[in-house]
Amino acid sequence: LKIVFIILTTINNVAAEETKIEHKIAIIVNEELISSYDIVQRIKLSALLSGISINEQNNQLFVNNAVDELIHEKLKKEKISEYEIEINETDYLEFEMNFYNRNNFDKETLISMLNDNNINYLDLKNLLENQILWNKLINALYFRLTSVSELEIEEIISKNPNITASQAKDLVIQRQLDLKSSKLLRDMLNEATIEYK
């Protein structure tokens, strides 16, 4: 509870500073805008989700991470639109529930904390939707190209004896998909027009 209070206090301080700022266009990514407001909101959301208080030592790191995340999201959305990837409400709700479970969050408590810190729930929903859409795109593009050898499975099992062969196979495939995802994003960044204002 003390950590949550410290985080909330820190986020409220960021929010107080935010009200003094006139928000402007900060970055243009392939003609898509990212405003200073978007960056501040992402900083607050990241701090809240990570449970880390923003201070002088980590403030610039939060800013840099927020900017990188927002640029990546704009590029991912472009590619998702290009391939017309969509999800239904059931897929989203399942992904959202997994997110809460993985991060030990209760949905109602998190939404209350978002409201207390003037963070719109839609910011979180958009973040999660973008993640699931990107995962779906990467699977559609690269899953059929993955392959798993017995040696890779045995290596994972030798390091983690409690893992089944099926789980080890899934880990190898996920690692390959993550590498493909990173490469695609790097290529998109290299081709993108990114203008800092």
Stretch-by-stretch model annotation:
Residues 46-58:
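Short, conserved catalytic-motif segment at the N-terminal edge
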Residues 14-18:
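Boundary at the C-terminal end of the N-terminal hydrophobic targeting segment
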